[in-house]
Amino acid sequence: MTEHQGVPISPFLRAMPCVLNYDPHFWQRVTSKTKTLIMPIQRPFNLQKWIDENRDLLKPPVSNKNLYVQAGDFIVMIVGGPNARKDYHFNEGEELFYQLEGEINVRVQEDGKAVDVAIKEGEMFLLPANVPHSPMRGENTIGLVIELVRDGRPMQDGLMWFCDECNHKLHEFRFPLRNIETDFQPRFREFYASEELRTCDNCTHVMEMDPRFV
């Protein structure tokens, strides 16, 4: 058995050059106490049947469900609507959107402006990394979203709010994402509970409080 950066390499791992070369943080994940090398092999399932049986999980205030919680590389989510979020999510990795039912709008910050990107049923959209984005989902919409697991990678997520009147940034949180189903809620509550954070430094407009998070 040989070593790589002080970590023993079994013949099994030496047979995986594509994985070792592709992911620069592979060894960090292998040696992490919180990660296993490979998740258990799961059998295929009928996605539409799963959606039909779990629609109650895809409603506010959470609206999303991670399908493979043991996966080490990808978060594979089903996301439902409606939502009424005004925040923008900031991800240092790319995000893949595939719209299964209905049409949604992803508002992005592009060249200092809020720009709407419509994703119709059956359409796919790859959002580049580091683009603030706010998915706006109507009632009876279902979408698939795939993004990178953050744990074991030097990545931080962000939540941002921009003024409704002049698009000036109101506030921003940066944090390591551990659980995509629960980690946003405390930041939502902190922002909406503070009139100071919701007040624009540029035009003095105050964003309305969202009673769901207070």
Where do the model's predicted regions map?
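Low-acidity, Ser/Thr- and Arg-rich intrinsically disordered low-complexity segments
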Residues: 10, 14, 29-32
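A short, N-terminal "cap"/entry segment at the start of jelly-roll beta-barrel domains
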Residues: 23-80, 85-87, 186-214
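His/acidic/aromatic-lined binding-pocket segments of jelly-roll/cupin-type domains
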Residues: 76, 87-90, 94-99, 116-117, ...
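Conserved metal-binding segment of the jelly-roll/cupin
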Residues: 79, 119-139, 147-148
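Short, conserved beta-strand element in jelly-roll/cupin
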Residues: 90-109, 143-146
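Cys/His-clustered metal-coordination modules, chiefly Zn-binding fingers
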Residues: 148-214
